[in-house]
Curated annotation (Swiss-Prot):
<feature type="site" description="Required for ADM2 interaction">
    <location>
        <position position="287"/>
    </location>
</feature>
<feature type="transmembrane region" description="Helical; Name=4">
    <location>
        <begin position="254"/>
        <end position="274"/>
    </location>
</feature>
<dbReference type="Pfam" id="PF02793">
    <property type="entry name" value="HRM"/>
</dbReference>
<feature type="site" description="Required for ADM interaction">
    <location>
        <position position="374"/>
    </location>
</feature>
<dbReference type="InterPro" id="IPR001879">
    <property type="entry name" value="GPCR_2_extracellular_dom"/>
</dbReference>
<feature type="topological domain" description="Extracellular">
    <location>
        <begin position="200"/>
        <end position="210"/>
    </location>
</feature>
<dbReference type="InterPro" id="IPR003287">
    <property type="entry name" value="GPCR_2_calcitonin_rcpt_fam"/>
</dbReference>
<feature type="signal peptide">
    <location>
        <begin position="1"/>
        <end position="22"/>
    </location>
</feature>
<keyword id="KW-0472">Membrane</keyword>
<dbReference type="GO" id="GO:0001605">
    <property type="term" value="F:adrenomedullin receptor activity"/>
</dbReference>
<feature type="transmembrane region" description="Helical; Name=3">
    <location>
        <begin position="211"/>
        <end position="239"/>
    </location>
</feature>
<feature type="transmembrane region" description="Helical; Name=2">
    <location>
        <begin position="177"/>
        <end position="199"/>
    </location>
</feature>
<comment type="function">
    <text>G protein-coupled receptor which specificity is determined by its interaction with receptor-activity-modifying proteins (RAMPs). Together with RAMP1, form the receptor complex for calcitonin-gene-related peptides CALCA/CGRP1 and CALCB/CGRP2. Together with RAMP2 or RAMP3, function as receptor complexes for adrenomedullin (ADM and ADM2). Ligand binding causes a conformation change that triggers signaling via guanine nucleotide-binding proteins (G proteins) and modulates the activity of downstream effectors. Activates cAMP-dependent pathway.</text>
</comment>
<feature type="topological domain" description="Cytoplasmic">
    <location>
        <begin position="316"/>
        <end position="330"/>
    </location>
</feature>
<dbReference type="GO" id="GO:0007189">
    <property type="term" value="P:adenylate cyclase-activating G protein-coupled receptor signaling pathway"/>
</dbReference>
<feature type="site" description="Required for RAMP2 interaction">
    <location>
        <position position="289"/>
    </location>
</feature>
<feature type="transmembrane region" description="Helical; Name=6">
    <location>
        <begin position="331"/>
        <end position="352"/>
    </location>
</feature>
């Protein structure tokens, strides 16, 4: 026990000395926080390494080998002579890429490689930051691409919601589901922008790991679940309408509200409790944990169930069309087609995530594709469910035509008034007749009756 304490004290002493010196200097508070986090990580790794060195059994294999060691940043196991050991770069520093590799060579004599310039044992960390500049540039591009995607999504979704709320003739249960789906995407885009700009992009905040950023991540994951479960509600509604209720019109929407807004709370809460117990760090942002399957699992299940419902709906509708050729079946087929297009598009990123390719260019292309698929979903949903919707297009076209006719009639009415005024002034100057003569120029009607001449726009569509 005394030996362990002495070793720990001996190797931690330089870090405490550095800490005292650093505290005497004036530095940026954020830099001090990041520096403190880096020191804590190194000290923790060092302590765990020496614990491992003392507790692991002695090498029993025959032959020459290099002894286990701590190189200052990473811990290395016993390695056979003439081989190269490799592990991932540490995440101590912002310019280190944990996906890159660190190498350490054990020579033929069973000694760790020494650098010729210093004649000291040396570990090759050069690959950890060799591509940092390019990766930072790519990360910034992806960041701006994400923000643009969510801004466009919010704008298109709000326009769509405005259309649905303004035109009362569009009100029906399916449009109500659309409204909830759109609202969930708006909320998700807003919280994502806040989360990316205020939390994920603030290394000092992530390092301190406050409760506020964990709440932000919790809301973000909850709303992401709401997006997919409202898509499931769309599929269930159509399935009930077409397959179960045989074209019945009314359904109870309470269960849809529970599924769309209530059920995603369950995996979000379970994930929060698990992260609090096992991975309570980095504002719960780190993705190198299997706990994310608590969120992604139900989402994938919802996508699969939705796909099954939609395929079954298509089967039933095709059968009905062959037998009855009902126009109503054609209308349902159009609604199903829109949902059937969206389901694979909204879920394809969960299929692609495990298949990340190898290679710099391939990884960059993959990142851009995943980024677009994930962060432009709101724009895609509003485009397919609203802007490409035949009913919406028809009512917008009809109202636009009414506006043009009304504007044209108002313009003609203004010209009529100007013409009448000119005629009155001419007659007054020439003959001195009363203004009642104006009625002849208005086909026997007075000025106040001219509104009755205007064609009523709504009559055009009776």
């Amino acid at each position: 026990m005394e030996k362990k304490f002495f070793l720990s004290f001996l190797f931690l002493l330089p870090f405490f000395m550095i800490l005292v010196i650093a505290e005497s200097e004036e530095e940026n508070p954020d830099d001090l926080i990041q520096l403190g986090v880096t020191r804590n990580k190194i000290m923790t790794a060092q302590y765990e390494c020496y614990q491992k060195i003392m507790q692991d059994p002695v090498q029993q294999t025959e032959g020459i080998y290099c002894n286990r060691t701590w190189d200052g940043w990473l811990c290395w196991n016993d390695v056979a002579a003439g081989t190269e050991s490799m592990q991932h770069c540490p995440d101590y520093f912002q310019d280190f890429d944990p996906s890159e590799k660190v190498t350490k060579i054990c020579d033929q004599d069973g000694n760790w490689f020494r650098h010729p310039a210093s004649n000291r044992t040396w570990t090759n960390y050069t690959q950890c930051n060799v591509n940092t500049h390019e990766k930072v540039k790519t990360a910034l591009n992806l960041f701006y691409l994400t923000i643009i995607g969510h801004v466009l999504s919010i704008a298109s979704l709000l326009i769509s919601l405005g259309i649905f709320f303004y035109f009362k003739s569009l009100s029906c249960q399916r449009i109500t589901l659309h409204k909830n789906l759109f609202f969930s995407f708006v909320c998700n885009s807003v919280i994502t922008i806040i989360h990316l700009t205020a939390v994920a992009n603030n290394q000092a905040l992530v390092a301190t790991n406050p409760v506020s950023c964990k709440v932000s991540q919790f809301i973000h994951l909850y709303l992401m679940g709401c997006n997919y479960f409202w898509m499931l509600c769309e599929g269930i509604y159509l399935h009930t309408l077409v397959v179960v209720a045989v074209f019945a019109e009314k359904q109870h929407l309470m269960w849809y509200y529970f599924l769309g807004w209530g059920f995603p709370l369950i995996p979000a809460c379970i994930h929060a409790v698990a992260r609090r117990l096992y991975y309570n760090d980095n504002c719960w942002i780190s993705s190198d944990t299997q706990l994310l399957y608590i969120i992604h699992g139900p989402i994938c299940a919802a996508l699969l169930v939705n796909l099954f419902f939609l395929l079954n709906i298509v089967r039933v509708l095709i059968t009905k069309l062959k037998v009855t050729h009902q126009a109503e079946s054609n209308l349902y087929m159009k609604a199903v087609r829109a949902t059937l297009i969206l389901v694979p598009l909204l879920g394809i990123e969960f299929v692609l995530i495990p298949w990340r390719p190898e290679g710099k260019i391939a990884e960059e292309i993959y990142d851009y594709i995943i980024n677009i698929l994930m962060h432009y979903q709101g724009l895609l949903v509003s485009t397919i469910f609203c802007f490409f919707n035949g009913e919406v297009q028809a009512i917008l076209r009809r109202n636009w035509n009414q506006y043009k006719i009304q504007f044209g009639n108002n313009f003609s009415h203004s010209d009529t008034l100007r013409s009448a005024s000119y005629t009155v002034s001419t007659i007054s100057d020439g003959t001195g007749y009363s203004h009642d003569c104006l009625s002849e120029h208005l086909n026997g009607k007075s000025i106040h009756d001219t509104d009755n001449v205007v064609i009523k726009p709504e009559k055009l569509y009776d």
